[in-house]
Amino acid sequence: LFNIVTPDRAYFGQKDAQQLAVIRRMVRDLNFGIQIVGCPIIREEDGLAKSSRNTYLSDEERQAALCLSRAVFAGQKMVQDGERDAKVVLDAMKAIIEAEPMAKIDYVKMVDFENIVQVEKIESEPVLCAMAVYIGKTRLIDNFIFDPSCNCSGSEAEGHCCCGHCSE
């Protein structure tokens, strides 16, 4: 499709961050002259990542599902505050999710954002912290991307870098 349409830019949501990483890699490997722009996750007022799957949740499950965003925000804060041990961050996130009786973790992982290879330490490359959790029979995903080399101010500008807060 990129060969047929030949766009200057293509926009992909960060919510499916693995797809975003694969598309970026493909564009780079195949030397397409396309800027792939990651669009930030859109969240409901209570923090839950917007998804068509949210409609499958009962009111009780919907409340239980908030453990995902609580875990994401807690992990993100730990990393922003300087924690670089992936296991420490992941264990804290898992504890938040496991405290919710209706939640069943499929996975919670931290990987190198470019290669999708699991990491033990956050060093100089962007990392993706992604999760999939069942709430009842509904599988929900959420994530955050952290780029240690990003010095953004936290203001959202067009383009969005890996951290989701500044231009690429």
Positions of PLM-derived features:
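Nucleotidyltransferase catalytic core that binds NTPs
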Residues: L1-K104, F113-N115, F144
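Phosphate/ribose-recognition catalytic cores of enzymes acting on nucleotide-derived substrates
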Residues: A92-E168
